[in-house]
Amino acid sequence: MGQKAKAQAPTTHPRPHTLSSQVAPALPRRPRHAAPESLRQARGEVMKAHLITYGCQMNEYDTHLVQSQLVSFGADIVESPDEADFVLVNTCAVRGKPVDKVRSLLGDLRKQKAQRSLVVGMMGCLAQLEEGQQIARKFEVDVLLGPGSLLDIGAALESNERFWGLQFKDELHDHIPPPPSGKLQAHLTIMRGCDHHCTYCIVPTTRGPQVSRHPDDILRELDMQLAAGVREVTLLGQNVNAYGVDQGAKLKGYPSFADLLRMVGASGIERVKFTTSHPMNFTEDVAAAIGETPAICEFVHLPVQSGSDRVLRRMAREYNREKYLTHIAQIKKHIPDVVLATDIIVGFPGETEEDFQDTLSLYDEVGYDSAYMFIYSPRPGTPSYKHFQDLPRELKTERLQRLIARQKDWSARKNAQKVGTVQQVLLRGDAHDAGFLEGHTRGNHPTVVPKAIGADGAGVYQVRIDHATPHMMYGHILGPDGQPLPEQPRFNPEAAAVGGALPML
């Protein structure tokens, strides 16, 4: 990548409120290798940077934002940490497992620092927490940036001391990064932070209160993405349904999320998706906007977390089973062919077998196409960690396996209904087997097809689905006449299997 790119100048808008700040503590000078005086003076040459991302799509967007800053400063982005002068790790703190991965990675990087000149940085949600700051001290991290201080990356690397940036800064919300290069898909952040306080969730602590981006900035960034060839955009926020209502106040000049969807859908973009939704703020108008706007994909991810009212109260989710099912009915009314996904936390403190059966029965009542399913992970700093006693891991794991089996059954049934249909599929590029292409439908179904004459690369195609498993669909690209295009290799679904476990069932 190595090309220089100019960062988009921010547009300023009157802010309805100012985010709180944290003062970074003074830190000792670097014990081994001082930071370069500038990005252009690392070992007398252009700095080489490598970025590693854990966690959600918001983190992927933030990594792209910081990477674009580094490129605009003159840094080269390299493919391997072994080639890099600067390694920056974007972290996740939602569950314990990604935190353990960060510890392991930082341990390896600390060993490398003992052998060569290397600057190590840590950003993202974990960096904002005391837990992450203790990890940073232990593993001699040089640069620490919270989610609200990402634009401090230049100042951090020009510092001759360890640099901690943990403030929530308004200018981050107005900054527009350049679009991704050569990609058909892009993320677009419409807001940051969250005003809900679910008892298990650390996000309000790590990302601060909700701040909606001005619609003009959103549409400007979308225009840049369209000009760069993007054909599918995913709108990102911790709670997109609350867009334009920050800390309980409706913002003047900001549309509702339903109207923002209509605006984005009318921009010329081919496909629009969004995540994440909170049922408390979901409205029927959002379902109506999806149903009436062709560009908005008929895919709705509406996390329920539990089918038990008692557990939902302990989670402080602010809705009950009946209200959630009302939203599902509204969605199915306006989007008859909707593809539904959800999130489930299994084994929340105090969950009984009866509570878990309520979750299983909700599955049968809704009929989810896919789900992200996790056992409860206690996170320091959350109310559930402080006040509730965790369930035995063996019990949580056993319930998770039962839930996975239930979801697998539903996924198999739902995917089987797609066999013989024609789906619009965005193909990103080569699958695990180079003779095949992989991508996803408008309903987010992972799909694999053989390369065809005249269709052997990334693009948006009509695909006839010929075979489906609970995890994957297989098909053939159709030509303008509706007939399958001639294949390049012989179609072998087993050879096209995508490597690695899929996150959704």
From Swiss-Prot:
GO terms for biological process: tRNA methylthiolation. Binds 2 [4Fe-4S] clusters. One cluster is coordinated with 3 cysteines and an exchangeable S-adenosyl-L-methionine. [4Fe-4S] cluster 1 binds at C56, C92, C125. GO terms for molecular function: 4 iron, 4 sulfur cluster binding; metal ion binding; N6-isopentenyladenosine methylthiotransferase activity. It comes from the Bacteria. Keywords: 4Fe-4S, Cytoplasm, Iron, Iron-sulfur, Metal-binding, S-adenosyl-L-methionine, Transferase, tRNA processing. Residues 416-479 form the TRAM domain. Catalyzes the methylthiolation of N6-(dimethylallyl)adenosine (i(6)A), leading to the formation of 2-methylthio-N6-(dimethylallyl)adenosine (ms(2)i(6)A) at position 37 in tRNAs that read codons beginning with uridine. This is tRNA-2-methylthio-N(6)-dimethylallyladenosine synthase. It comes from Deinococcus radiodurans (strain ATCC 13939 / DSM 20539 / JCM 16871 / CCUG 27074 / LMG 4051 / NBRC 15346 / NCIMB 9279 / VKM B-1422 / R1). The lineage of its organism: Bacteria, Thermotogati, Deinococcota, Deinococci, Deinococcales. The gene is miaB.
